[in-house]
Amino acid sequence: MRYLSKDILEEVITQRPSDSYKSNFGRVVLIGGNRQYGGAIIMSTEACINSGAGLTTVITDVKNHGPLHARCPEAMVVGFEETVLLTNVVEQADVILIGPGLGLDATAQQILKMVLAQHQKQQWLIIDGSAITLFSQGNFSLTYPEKVVFTPHQMEWQRLSHLPIEQQTLANNQRQQAKLGSTIVLKSHRTTIFHAGEPFQNTGGNPGMATGGTGDTLAGIIAGFLAQFKPTIETIAGAVYLHSLIGDDLAKTDYVVLPTKISQALPTYMKKYAQPHTAPDSELLEQKRSR
């Protein structure tokens, strides 16, 4: 087991090359937010943008377009019903996050089916929230499981892995991860990341973070990190640790840690831990273009 510390942030977060432009930091598509749960996708979007994604597009119910533009004017918005545009946007993404506030209705099932069918080898796909439940209940499969990240809490992991919570031991979780072939960010008071190698365990987090939207915010940070930094398990771990580090610092003064406060603090914390890059600017940008 590898225990996360601030070292992971210095390993992952790098200063931006001087000749950067927005496309160098990834195209992210976030999908979710039905009429009832629009706040979930808005919080994911805010976290994704504040964690540094270059271009962010949100596919959501039309009822959420106004609130999302008001809260996150940096994001572009597409409606669930805009099938052709939706398909084109997903095709062009570097990272896709589906699930926050998506719901479990026929529209949600149809969108998940489309995203799974369109998933390309070069794309990272993050499956969160109700999309995990839909995936668990449906006859779905993964074309490139090694490029998929599931972000379940323990009950969602029970549905996905068929392991009752009391049987979710380290060994059992590792076996189920191997069967899926994807990365599992298993959220709990000590979130653990299961992948093909040695698991990571988070050392941060606090009871003040036990509030709605915390997981949506984490999913958005993971998406933003994968879009702009090296697409590795360490990058996912860095997102997990930074989320809890900010939460722990806020908990020193706040009884409840609002997820939106975590998002607002992201640029400041990332600036603090960003390390100089060793390759020339032109080489770094070329690596990003060819990913």
Swiss-Prot record:
Its EC number is 4.2.1.136. It comes from the Bacteria. Keywords: ATP-binding, Lyase, NAD, NADP, Nucleotide-binding. AMP binds at G215. Transmembrane segments: none annotated. It is an enzyme of class 4 (lyase). HAMAP family: NADHX_dehydratase (MF_01965). Catalyzes the dehydration of the S-form of NAD(P)HX at the expense of ADP, which is converted to AMP. Together with NAD(P)HX epimerase, which catalyzes the epimerization of the S- and R-forms, the enzyme allows the repair of both epimers of NAD(P)HX, a damaged form of NAD(P)H that is a result of enzymatic or heat-dependent hydration. This is ADP-dependent (S)-NAD(P)H-hydrate dehydratase.
